[in-house]
Amino acid sequence: MSNIIKYKKKILNGDLLTKEEVEELLEEDITDLAATANEIRESLCGNKFDLCTIINGKSGRCQENCKYCAQSAHFDTDIIEYNILNSDRIINSAISNYNKGVHRFSVVTSGRALNNNEVDTLCKTYSKLKETCSIRLCASHGLLKYEDLKRLKDSGVTRYHNNLETSRKFFTKICTTHKYDDKIETIKNAKKAGIEICSGGIIGLGETMEDRIDMAFTLRELSVESVPVNILNPIKGTPLENQEILSYEEIIKTLALFRFILPTVQIRLAGGRTIISDKGKKALESGVNGAISGDMLTTLGIETSEDIKMIKNLGFEV
């Protein structure tokens, strides 16, 4: 019996794989690995597909030095900078996306964390939005404290996004202005506030497959509900502007392994799809059951109507 079949049976019996068992899958055929990851997804998660979209609610001037990010003030990337968007702009965007068939809508803001006035402003917007539209509200506002996260929860936010980005071991190679434990503390505080967690990372930063596996196991320990996987789209002006883009095979392998490690979570194909050949079609057949649609924060994405057509053609329910 191959390791793929053996470990699929173990997972479907309700058991979780160890890190050593996952490492045994590294040499398996990628096509078989992806197909089996998709079978695990279908058996444990069904065919429901979770589609979300984001809006850049505050852009640029970030004091953090994440090497991949166009919004860092440490780098010269020529992005447009602005403060918190007005309420009407955010609400209209949410309604528009809801009418297109999107399930979740997230306001994402630059910076280490919002200040009290910014939290107040967005909480008022979330409260209005909750009364106006049935779209599920997500938020990504940096390393907030418990009290602010509770305010978001009370305003209608159901899920908080805070990426680990990579493994603990590799993290210091991409950011030195905050710590891995700062992220973990934020995630734990959001859970304490009663908010679901969306946390994943970026692949293609120069990390190893071992780093990706380590991150996935940390996410499993944190019991997150959604794991977005971004593919690095190198931005001119950042330290990673010349980083080699991952092969599609490596992307598919990573996604499939994540399904073996995280059998019941939403694995969400996120930024970077425009740089791969089929806009993510093969990736969506590798254990994935969610995606971010539309434009990303500082890069272009894929039209929601195009995404929904592709997702339905693959047999998912949107």
UniProtKB/Swiss-Prot annotation:
Positions annotated to bind [4Fe-4S] cluster: C62, C66, C69
Annotated pathway: Cofactor biosynthesis; biotin biosynthesis; biotin from 7,8-diaminononanoate: step 2/2
GO MF term list: 2 iron, 2 sulfur cluster binding; 4 iron, 4 sulfur cluster binding; biotin synthase activity; iron ion binding
Alphabetical list of CDD domains matching this protein: Radical_SAM
Annotated GO biological process: biotin biosynthetic process
Family per record: Belongs to the radical SAM superfamily. Biotin synthase family.
Protein name: Biotin synthase
